[in-house]
Amino acid sequence: MAAKSGSLSINSENIFPIIKKWLYSDHDIFYRELISNGCDAVTKLKKLDMMGEYSLPEGYKGRVDVIVDPEKKTLTFKDNGLGMTSDEVEEYINQIAFSGATDFIEKYKDKSNSDQIIGHFGLGFYSAFMVADEVHIDTLSYKDGAKAVHWECDGGTEFSMEDGDKTDVGTTITLFLNEDCLEFCNEYKAREVVKKYCSFMPTEIYLSKANTKETQIIKEEEKLPDDEVLEEIEPEKKEKTEGENAEAEAAEEPKKLKIRKRPELINETQPLWTKHPNECTKEEYLDFYRKVFQDYKEPLFWIHLNMDYPFNLKGILYFPKINMEYESIEGTIKLYNNQVFIADNIKEVIPEFLLLLKGVIDCPDLPLNVSRSALQNDGFVKKIAEYITKKVADKLAGMCKTDKEEYDKYWDDISPFIKFGCLKDDKFCEKMNDYILFKNLDGKYLTLPECLEIKPQDEEENKENAVDENGNKVEAEVVEDKAEDEASEENTEEEKKEKIIYYVTDEQQQSQYINMFKAAKMDAVILTHNIDQPFISQLEQKNEGIKFQRIDADVTDALKSKTSKKAEKEMEEQAESISKLMKKALKNDKITIKVEKLKNKKISSMITLSEESRRMQDMMKMYSMPGMDMSAFGGEGETLILNANHPLVQYITEHQDGENAEMICEQLYDLAKLQHAPLDADAMTKFVARSNDIMMLLTK
């Protein structure tokens, strides 16, 4: 071939500045593009052999070599694939944006598996100019009579092409790095980048350093054809003792060779996700997880995706074990295209809530743009996301049905993920509705229907404690007869009545309320995660007639002693009288005060805040509006409940003009506040001082 020079067939001379600054967001991505081209060349050659159009040499093993040379400031990518003729160089290299892979598939679409061809974009080779001032190509085609070709370009639109001296089939691309990118010919940096993008490419990838001084010792029988022998190491002779008489005889060890350090194999050509789930062991799944995510905490469980129709998708999703107190929930879903790494956490393909997991997904059918770094947001991509969501929901539902005990163990770890998924995806929420669990006060895990079946109090206890209008005990049989007479009316009212599920957000802070509930044989569920509040709001919207109420939002009838109407009237009068004293002592006219006969006689006072008001306060805190008056929104403030069964409340009721009445009122209020929420600094200072005064009174 006569030497040739010319201009690249492009639309604009500004193509290289665009490639360098815009086409690829990560400059190290040229590694992926050039190695992918080499893998494609190897795959194509193997396909031609399978179709009978070429015979591979005996013992052929496809490979791509990455060779760093810090002294010459070069980076070389070498493959033993099908190579190129001068015409193909003209077509695939000199005409930018023409894809060799696309042309190859079109020609052999009836004979080959096009899914195995990685390259789609034609511009991949030109990513080399992101880091190189000059690029050389040396190539020799597999075709009979083909001549080697040498091609050069200095990053402008001019190139030169002539006969080359390459003698082995394949392609070698040499990058002469610019001064700003010399880090890429560092062996450690090269290893890092190749592992990042090419850890699972289907062709073996080797990394080496040109003219390395490093050596290794091997046995003579382990020598490979490409090994460079630096020294033959003669075996040592040693004395061997046999029998009674010691005789020196030569006992030779195997002959050894000192060779230049071999290229390092970087990738795994058959990653776990390419296998059928039935072929994978638990230990293989765990090893893969540790290797890919550098997380040595064992995952809870995993889902192996394996789909061939209507699109090709494989992958493994792991549910990591999360320390809820100390760790943020951040996952990583690695997206691959034919075992070539594309990016982490691409939201167009991976549903947002699944980004809390760790895993890999490989989909050869993904419609990528020219840089392979983004996805076209189309209907196909949406179907992929829907399929992944469905598989995750099916796995969780199946686990709950077939192994509820194991599902219960996982629940605390996976509940934030599932609840987030329900908030973000209506279809996922619909599938998971019957498999969402709630942990109750006894540590049992209940479904939503099971929570709704919890009775508010023990019916037998109601019968035993029933009294008439005058406070006299009523026999249980009378209660039953009366209940039967009112049954039809109650059934009608029950249909309209909201079903309340009580919940706890802080088991320590709300311990007094929990003890009261347990004493009354009532139950509540534990909701301590930040996501629980928006989640229960969604449940209320989707399930008519269900209401969630925090355990300290109100004093239910089940926590009160049964009283006659006469006693209720007396308490109302007491409340009116004592309310004036409390408001005066607290210097607070807005507080609501109630007097109730609580079953637990050890509790003197308690604070309640309606569910609506508390949620409004939480919302205001979220939007940085703390301290706003609830009444402006139609909400109620705090209510102070005084227990008429407690001696202190009885004392101030009878001694409202007493010397210490106001001090006792203040102490009752602060004790109630402490059980509800922490006191602010000023209130705590006063509380401590007052407590000391009370103890001083006890010493007199």
PLM region descriptions:
Residues I117, V135-E158, N178-C181, Y188-K700:
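GHKL/Bergerat-fold ATPase module in large chromosome/replication-associated machines
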Residues M1-E179, E183-F184, E192, S199, ...:
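GHKL (Bergerat-fold) ATPase N-terminal catalytic module, capturing the glycine-rich phosphate-binding loop
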